[in-house]
Amino acid sequence: MEIVDTRTPNSKRFISGVTGDWEVIIGMEVHAQIISNSKLFSGASTKFGAEPNNHVSLIDAAMPGMLPVLNQECVRQAVRTGLGLKARINLRSVFDRKNYFYPDLPQGYQISQFRYPIVGEGKIIISIGPDSNGQFEDIEVGIERLHLEQDAGKSMHDQHPTMSFVDLNRSGVALMEIVSKPDMRSADEAKAYMTKLRTIVRYLGTCDGNMDEGSMRADVNVSVRRPGESFGTRCEIKNVNSIRFIGQAIEYEARRQIAILEDGGVIDQETRLFDAAKGETRSMRSKEEAHDYRYFPDPDLLPLEFDQAFVDALAAELPELPDDIKIRFINEMGLTAYDASILVTEKAIANYFEKVAHGRDGKTVANWVINDLLGALNKDNREIEETPVSPDQLGSIIDLIKEGTISGKIAKDLFEIIWHEGGDPRQIVEERNMKQVTDTKAIERAVDEIMANNSDKVAQAKQKPALAGWFVGQVMKTTGGKANPQTVNELVKLKLGID
């Protein structure tokens, strides 16, 4: 099958080699574990973290005479994902046997979908940026297909000095293999694609996206070429399990291939592994072609068929997806594309923001959520679900600023108190005497005192109005940050006789 390159070469994404510029071509095959209580063809549990071989049915262990029974929930989840990817849903698909031998594959074959997948072509829009002008570039990455398949078990090599063991808990767990077109041209684009795909499946509730648990992992296909030429020979980097590692693997592999080609060599089509400790890829085996797996329709499973009404019913139940929420945040709340993009990265963050923003200024709330809340969560290595500051508490802090009860600086201190100690914001302000000083006469006395003690700076400020900020800072310091900043600023300018 001929692959059509739909993207125009862009010099800002070229990689400089010794003999000229190169372009990296990237496609990805992402294995996403479906959220379901039981496996694709058996009733065994899919719960993560159990003792080895505790969630294994006779079907998973490939005992003779045991026939697979398709889990309908897994079918629904695959269709939901396809709809979320704006993809064509195939009303008829076929399960095939993919034949290969591996110790953690008891059947000697994997049940997958080869010729007739459940989901056809779709697309994902990724945003790259911001650039030096604060602008984002939106790039469409095509989805080739999505098909259902079984996961294999897990080989364990660290349990005994001379023997390996097999854990079949994962054997038979339902996977969606989501295959992109080779539309990505940089490590940043690949990372953005993986991030966006993970966000979509999490919003849909079809995969938890926990890469550290292996429930989402990527096979990354990398090749290089001279700009405008035909695609080069690709290498596949298997089972990359973090977004950061995806970027590192691509950057190393592209440089490796460029070095070989510039030295007059040729690229072997092969499967490689990424060594995270060394930051490099290494050869695993020669890359198999489809005929090596001897695909044929599974005789134990009928073709999977459903009608359009089944698809329409699932489409009607889909949640609002990140791209739609982002547009709404920009259009209805006046947020920048950058802020909106951050707020929709996780459904829980978007929900938190919306709760706080209800009846309040969206830009102000976005600033607090992004800079203060997410900053504190990142510092403490917590998830949004673990935040000690509830939407109601943050909303109260913002209300206190708007009412003029506290200043922005006091609000930051109040946020810290609630983060570490909890409590009602209004009650804390009352009990700790945190209200800002709004008495003009009291503020004026503080301004007069500072100016009287710094007559030299007064003279300088009259010549250089920018120095007025020094007086504002001193007044705020003297009043413990409680003076109303706007009132202080106005009085300082009035006393100095500047506009």
Swiss-Prot record:
This is Aspartyl/glutamyl-tRNA(Asn/Gln) amidotransferase subunit B. Heterotrimer of A, B and C subunits. It comes from the Bacteria. GO terms for biological process: glutaminyl-tRNAGln biosynthesis via transamidation; translation. The keyword Protein biosynthesis applies. The gene is gatB. Disulfide bonds: none annotated. Pfam families: GatB_N, GatB_Yqey. SMART domains: GatB_Yqey. Allows the formation of correctly charged Asn-tRNA(Asn) or Gln-tRNA(Gln) through the transamidation of misacylated Asp-tRNA(Asn) or Glu-tRNA(Gln) in organisms which lack either or both of asparaginyl-tRNA or glutaminyl-tRNA synthetases. The reaction takes place in the presence of glutamine and ATP through an activated phospho-Asp-tRNA(Asn) or phospho-Glu-tRNA(Gln). Its EC number is 6.3.5.-. Gene3D superfamilies: 1.10.10.410, GatB domain, N-terminal subdomain (1.10.150.380).
